[in-house]
Amino acid sequence: MAEAHQASSLLSSLSSDGAEVELSSSVWQEIYLSALRSWKRNLWRVWNDFLAGVVPATPLSWLFLFSTIQLACLLQLDPSLGLMEKIKELLPDWGGQHHQLQGLLAAAVFASCLWGTLIFTLHVALRLLLSHHGWLLEPHGTMSSPTKTWLALVRIFSGRHPRLFSFQRALPRQPVPGAQETVRKYLESMRPVLRDDAFDSVVALANDFLRLQAPRLQLYLQLKSWCASNYVSDWWEEFVYLRSRGSLVNSTYYMMDFLYVTPTPLQAARAGNAVHTLLLYRHLLNRQEIPPTLLMGMRPLCSAQYERMFNTTRIPGVEKDYLCHLQDSQHVAVFHQGRFFRVGTHSSNGLLSPRALEQQFQYILDDPSPACPLEEHLAALTAAPRSMWAQVRESVKTHAATALETVEGAAFFVSLDSEPAGLTRENPAASLDTYAHTLLTGQGHDRWFDKSFTLIVFSNGKLGLSVEHSWADCPVAGHLWEFTLATECFQLGYATDGHCKGHPDPALPKPQRLQWDLPKQIQPSISLALRGAKTLSGNIDCHVFPFFHFGKSFIKGCHVSSDSFIQLVLQLAHFRDRGQFCLTYESAMTRLFLEGRTETVRSCTREACQFVRAMENKERTDQQCLALFREAVDKHQALLKAAMSGQGIDRHLFALYIMSRLLHMQSPFLTQVQSQQWLLSTSQIPVQQTHLFDVHNYPDYVSSGGGFGPAHDHGYGVSYIFMGENAISFHISSKQSSTETDSHRLGQHIEDALLDVASLFQAGQQFKRQFTGLGESSGWKYSNLSCKTVDPNIPKSSTNL
């Protein structure tokens, strides 16, 4: 098989005595280097875990403590109050000549015990500090004296240079809300979207639930919260993602490249820099040298989702998938024009340079060999229903185990697409829509959807990222993507001719072509999967539009939360689009807690509906609408803060539902809750998490974010990102098959709603619509649309990577 890239070093010959195997020196060298890398990696992992575990202390603090104890002993003082003498008695008797050594060992043991006790005390104190969420409830943009004191203590107990996983032992566990309060909030959220008779029916079911099932379910859930790291996250991963039997196309999300700039038009060069940067990130991740994410620059978030970022594959099962995570991987799997390749990422000198990786990718692009039978569309199986793929995978594993293991064991998947993508001068609107659609679905057979993420490199040098959702949520993948774009462009850079910097390596082994010896019996399954994938892809309606009339700076000037501002705009736009209110899903993170993931903010509140109705009522004045707008913003902020502090609605009800199923309890109320449909699913894409470069100094280097598919056949998926201070980008998705939705129509309503809401803050001066769709007056900077090579002398970020 092609997996054996050192086959030329393994010489086999037959003699009369049987088979003889001669191992050449290069094989022994490779075995030695592999073992050395493994030992070094394991030692680094142990050392980094140790450093993360003792934060805020350091090994130097132990040395200082030990030296202080020794100094006290020299001064004939006993800081241990007799404990060191007890320790000496427990040590072996080595004779009088080793009395001094016994004293040193006793002092070291006492110093270690005292040091460990101090660290434990600091961890307990830090956990108590991090359990405080009162700062979340303060008015937007203000900080009271108690909060300032709390923040100062958090910084003191956090240490000077915390590592990525330093806070994991100190993070509090996610609390289980009270059942009465959760049900009350749920009924409050349902009131705006239900008729009176339907609402009365839900109230009756809720009362029965609180009286009959809630006490027992709540008790068991409390017991689980005491025993598990998080009372809901493991069930969320299993039942929402891994037990889902639908296509992964429905749950993936994507991220885009820079909007205006393409650093190089050379596909292989961009792939080389990007892959090198991603593996640099993995190196920093393994050594825990990535700083932990701090909310508002002060409160650490859980970093557990980073652990399965690389070397991870979702393996299909008949009833349930599972995530296979490897400790390390020394290659990436590459797909190009129906063919699979293995590209090694390391040599005896470590990680390959960007120029060496470019050389490997260029070889693949230049390779004229055709795809093997059944190979071209094989990846369509990963887009098939999971149970079907699980059954076919057994046959693939039997006949092409080496190739399958190579793909599933890769650090990540790389797709070298044959078409260009990105913003174009000729048709900016349509080009962005096509770009988003390609990132979300591909052609149905050119993405290995099981991998944790797929790096997509287009023929004109544009990049994109497609992410499988089960292992992590958008902010974690977004952190990786920000690092990748900033580092490969600003830190690594490109030569003046567009190639990666450095020199090719003529001695580098060529990429290995994977061989798929597949039986013809799986041809119908591949064809069926391909038809299904193309049907799913063709049914997705994607629309991306940047809005340039104003952005975050203007919203800040209105003294309201930017996220709440957009959420109310979406409520107004959706009402104009559908003529009714609906359940709205906004994703909020719960990473303030250990292994926290997300919670739902139900943005369609009574206050939001009152504001929307006022905006549609010509008899209401701007002052009245503005007052209702501020009430709706305050309500949304309260819901968002409650969700972030573990007092949300939906994850608690979800956990109660799973517990009822495990206990074989029938709850019509919980069944009704879980059957509700989210017709509007929204999310804000985080930006500037890494601070590797200042987007204000380089306004052309903004990304238009990313998006996801709709959660319902007749619903919308809407994501948004603030591009700098003066622009907002929206990604809208819906189903072509629905007669009730239209992504472009909703986009126009969002644009109108943004202008109408902004006009409320202009003291009677209306924002004038300057364009319909995307035209020259919309603020598009046509001078920046070219995909030319970036000036290699561009100023670099001051951040030391």
Swiss-Prot record:
Coiled coil: none annotated. It is found in: Synapse; Cell projection, Dendrite; Cell projection, Axon; Endoplasmic reticulum membrane. Residues 1-49, 125-801 are cytoplasmic. It is a multi-pass membrane protein. The keyword Acyltransferase applies. (R)-carnitine binds at residues 585, 587, 598. GO terms for cellular component: AMPA glutamate receptor complex; axon; dendrite; endoplasmic reticulum; endoplasmic reticulum membrane; glutamatergic synapse; postsynapse. It is an enzyme of class 3 (hydrolase). Its main location: other. It catalyses: S-hexadecanoyl-L-cysteinyl-[protein] + H2O = L-cysteinyl-[protein] + hexadecanoate + H(+). Residues 760-801 are annotated as: Required for interaction with GRIA1. Gene3D superfamilies: 6.10.250.1760, Chloramphenicol acetyltransferase-like domain, Choline/Carnitine o-acyltransferase, domain 2. One of its GO terms (biological process) is regulation of postsynaptic membrane neurotransmitter receptor levels. The active site is at 469 (proton acceptor). Peripherally associated with AMPAR complex. AMPAR complex consists of an inner core made of 4 pore-forming GluA/GRIA proteins (GRIA1, GRIA2, GRIA3 and GRIA4) and 4 major auxiliary subunits arranged in a twofold symmetry. One of the two pairs of distinct binding sites is occupied either by CNIH2, CNIH3 or CACNG2, CACNG3. The other harbors CACNG2, CACNG3, CACNG4, CACNG8 or GSG1L. This inner core of AMPAR complex is complemented by outer core constituents binding directly to the GluA/GRIA proteins at sites distinct from the interaction sites of the inner core constituents. Palmitoyl thioesterase specifically expressed in the endoplasmic reticulum of neurons. Modulates the trafficking of the glutamate receptor, AMPAR, to plasma membrane through depalmitoylation of GRIA1. Also regulates AMPR trafficking through the regulation of SACM1L phosphatidylinositol-3-phosphatase activity by interaction in a malonyl-CoA dependent manner. Binds malonyl-CoA and couples malonyl-CoA to ceramide levels, necessary for proper spine maturation and contributing to systemic energy homeostasis and appetite control. This is Palmitoyl thioesterase CPT1C. It comes from Rattus norvegicus (Rat).
